[in-house]
């Protein structure tokens, strides 16, 4: 069984519990063991535009904690994965910045060495575990559910630093969904942003972005909508009703984490997957 240090980030363990619950249910069935380490802090991505050195120091500190235990890091939140990956990219190629950051880490007897890989949700499910291994665990295929996929911004952008899937035509979520019996289909707004990062300054615009995408999904007759990001999930699931008001629509789109749908196909109970915590009408697909 392969072991990874679980880097939970901030949003998943404080708000988006269903993501963590579903991860912890499906991964042991796929021979993955998550190791919980003490001392992790925020990934620092929200600070990037304010202070680069602080941003790198916080990210490097998190990586160093895992390196100390000789573990690679599994970061299921795409924003966290981007922050840690970008930090690793910079420190591995800029010796002076590496030294500067390590001077800060020395206060805690930590050192960034660059020995731990940073693994995303798509890296783990699609590339490391693989669709064949996932298929072996499927007990209740999803009966050709027509599903709209949402990648979000941080899984596929910026492409020049290397992201888990293609920035213009990502297909890894689709490949996984087909493996568990679902029927993912293309729609024009597939690559659009959820709007979540506009909440601080332009909350109405954030909800409009959310509403526009969900309205398209609903109008096109999709059975469900799937994502892998706790920030995006907050927009599409928890804020769906308010988002509908901005586009003059009553939105009733079931929104799932990819890990929840995988869990359902494995025959895991809805309670263990945290489906009772989803605020969108996920019960609508119960009879499909």
Task: Name what the model sees in each region.
Residues 1-288:
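Iron-sulfur cluster-binding electron-transfer modules in prokaryotic oxidoreductases
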């Amino acid at each position: 069984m392969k072991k990874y240090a679980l880097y939970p980030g901030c949003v998943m363990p404080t708000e988006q519990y269903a993501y963590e619950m579903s991860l912890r249910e499906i991964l042991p069935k796929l021979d993955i063991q998550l190791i919980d380490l003490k001392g992790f802090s925020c990934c620092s991505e929200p600070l990037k535009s304010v202070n680069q050195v602080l941003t790198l120091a916080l990210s490097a500190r998190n990586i160093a904690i895992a390196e100390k235990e000789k573990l690679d890091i599994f970061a299921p939140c795409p924003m966290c994965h981007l922050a840690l990956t970008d930090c690793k990219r910079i420190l591995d190629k800029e010796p002076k910045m590496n030294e500067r950051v390590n001077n800060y880490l020395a206060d805690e007897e930590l050192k960034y060495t660059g020995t731990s890989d940073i693994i995303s949700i798509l890296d783990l499910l699609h590339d490391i575990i693989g669709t064949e291994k996932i298929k072996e665990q499927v007990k209740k295929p999803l009966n050709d559910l027509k599903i709209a996929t949402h990648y979000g911004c941080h899984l596929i952008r910026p492409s020049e630093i290397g992201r888990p899937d293609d920035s213009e035509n990502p297909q890894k979520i689709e490949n996984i969904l087909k493996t568990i019996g679902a029927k993912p289909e293309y729609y024009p707004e597939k690559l659009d942003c959820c709007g979540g990062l506009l909440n601080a300054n332009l909350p109405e615009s954030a909800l409009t972005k959310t509403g526009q995408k969900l309205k398209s999904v609903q109008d096109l007759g999709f059975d469900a909508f799937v994502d892998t990001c706790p920030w995006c999930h907050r927009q599409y699931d928890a804020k769906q009703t308010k988002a509908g008001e901005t586009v003059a629509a009553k939105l009733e789109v079931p929104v799932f984490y990819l890990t929840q749908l995988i869990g359902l196909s494995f025959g895991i109970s809805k309670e263990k997957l945290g489906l009772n915590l989803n605020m969108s009408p996920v019960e609508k697909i119960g009879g499909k």
